Amino acid sequence: VYEKLVYGDAKHVCISSLSKEAYEHTIVINGMSKAFAMTGWRIGYSAAPADIAHGLKDIQGHTTSNGVTFIQWAAIAALENCDDDVAYMVEEYKKRRDYTFNRLTAMRGITCKNVDGAFYLLPDVSYYYGRTVNGKEIKDSFDFCSYILDEAHVAIVPGAAFNAPEGVRVAYTNSMDKIVEALDRMEKALAKIQ
């Protein structure tokens, strides 16, 4: 779902393109939610060898209902006509990523690797674990996120949910104005931690 959301010289490589054998043994399952901003519409597609595709169709047909017709048409239109829109969105996300990365890494105790794709960063905030604020200890990413939500009114996601207990997931999908405001609030909240 992130194959179109790559920055700079980074390229998405589908495993099926590596060799004929890989092609014959690869199942691609993809969705429209990220690259085409169709989150919540729950529409996607699969590509696989014919025998597997028939099995997938049978499973899907017995576990979920079909997507609403207008959503199916919207997905087709997105795949056929939205390359320029996606390219614009990627450029905007790159600007927001760069700004968010620079702001986060300038904050006391936060380290972060930059990313070549997607629309979120996963900074390491473990510097704050074991520290206290308002009489409460920050023990983990859940406590850290709760504090930031309560104090700064900024929603971030515990990294533990992504097998990264030292980190938090920070999305940069909002407008630049909102990102600036959120990071300003977050920085002020971090300054209060002892």
Model-derived features with residue positions:
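PLP-dependent class I/II
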Residues: 1-194
